[in-house]
Amino acid sequence: MELIVIIITLAFCILLYGTRWRAALDPREPRLISPTVPLIGHILGIATDGFGYFSKLNDKYGLPAFSLQMPLSRLYVITSSELVPAIQRQSQNIRFDTFEFTLAAERVGGVSGPGLKLLKGSIVDELQHAMHHALIGHGLDAMNLSMIEAIKPSIDELQSQKQAAFDLFAWCKRSITMASTDSVYGPMNPFRSIEVERAFWDFASNMNMIILNVLPFLTARKSLDDRRKVVDALTEYYNLGGHENSSEMTYGRWEVQYNKGITTQDIARMEIVNAIGVLSNTAPSTFWTLFEIYSRPSLLRDLRQELVASAVYTHPGTDGGIVRTIDLSAVRAKCSLLLGTFQEVLRMRSNAIVTRMVHEDTILNERVLFKKGSVIVIPARCVNREKSVWGETGDSFDAYRYLGQGKSGTSRSGRNVTRVAFQSFGTAPNICPGRHFASGEILAVVAMVILRFDMEPVLGEWIPPKANVKTLASSIQTPAGEFMVTLRERKEFKDDKWDFRVTEGDSKFPLLVG
């Protein structure tokens, strides 16, 4: 959700703070980078390259922080982890604002009028509390159990492919959507409808004009229609009482809003924002993890050996055959290479942007001034690859760099990796609350797929598909098109049956967070 918020913040900071930036740059502020095209150059850069534009500027200038002058406003872009702890310590002056929450509700969900007024004040904290509480302990355990039951049939169906080519990313989207939404929304899950699922993904991939509010009734008519279809389905879901037999998270969010007098339709509109957070990162993360593993035969071999040795338990089935069970608790506790591979995917493929508003003039590390009314952005793509932290291989994928990591993290070369140099889940105190659920789902899929199947790209080479740099919904790079593959069942496990095992109370993953 935070990636959506930064887009909205960029769109509205001009209106909110524009007149304050006509003054000259204070010499203590980060260096001002002038656009190649006066006034609109930076806007054109973001429109063309997405948030990769910040990375391009970082590569060109190599500054720990810099300022961008928009037509009427200024942004501070932080590219070095050195400044992140100082920002965290100034959480009273530099913070994630509640107004950004209401802007997301208005632009993404379409909440308006009285409903928008109700989404202010204490309700923001209450909704966040409901989500955080539901995504740890019993609530997380229940969602994990439901997710496992829903994801296994999708993996079993891959056996029927029999070397027929299929789009790997489309499969990830469909499988993750069904498993995630079944666990979140329960038996009456509205996303089981193919029409609703398709409308959601079409909307999530084409929100630009809606968020920027550029005559959306003309420029984004299809996106508005897609949103309406999802809102109608969610409204019916609540009217029929689907939330009464759903996850603790879904019921908790509904209860907070219902008790505040928010209408069912506006609750449904707010749920679109939540659904984007649930789905838009998990599917591409699953795709890239499978891609990076299968494109590296030696890594694939090592991961298979690790899983078989540490997390797969074999026992006879009722029909006399063999059942192989993957224990997800063992994956968390014993499969450090698989966790490292996943973490490296997040490090290298992150499109996340941390955003903060500055409420008072603030000097960081006794030398850098951030002025009141400014917007701070921290692109994970820059911080996650910082060579002063990650070493000269910071721009390269290395799944082995986390082996033997300590509390802060130590790379294979012994280099200390501080948590603030990993921004894929955001930065404290606003860390992604759903990271443990998403991680469990992704690693369950990846573990079973790589153990059961060999996979080859139709084109013969593992050439990374182009990323859709303009998608606003995902904090992970999303493939811009199809990626066709074929697979076959591994001979050593042919005709074996597979299952998962989940241990309640043991659902948190030891991943780096900022």
Swiss-Prot record:
Pathway: Secondary metabolite biosynthesis
Transmembrane intervals: 2-24
Entry GO CC: membrane
CDD domains in the record: CYP7_CYP8-like (cd11040)
Swiss-Prot/TrEMBL cofactor(s): heme
Molecular functions per Gene Ontology: heme binding; iron ion binding; monooxygenase activity; oxidoreductase activity, acting on paired donors, with incorporation or reduction of molecular oxygen
Glycan attachment positions: N144, N245, N416
Gene3D superfamilies: Cytochrome P450 (1.10.630.10)
Enzyme's top EC category: oxidoreductase
Described purpose of this protein according to its UniProt entry: Cytochrome P450 monooxygenase; part of the gene cluster that mediates the biosynthesis of the indole diterpenes nodulisporic acids (NA). Nodulisporic acid A (NAA) and its chemically modified derivatives are of particular significance because of their highly potent insecticidal activity against blood-feeding arthropods and lack of observable adverse effects on mammals, in particular the tremogenicity associated with the paspaline-derived IDTs is not observed.
Protein name (Swiss-Prot/TrEMBL): Cytochrome P450 monooxygenase nodJ
Organism: Hypoxylon pulicicidum
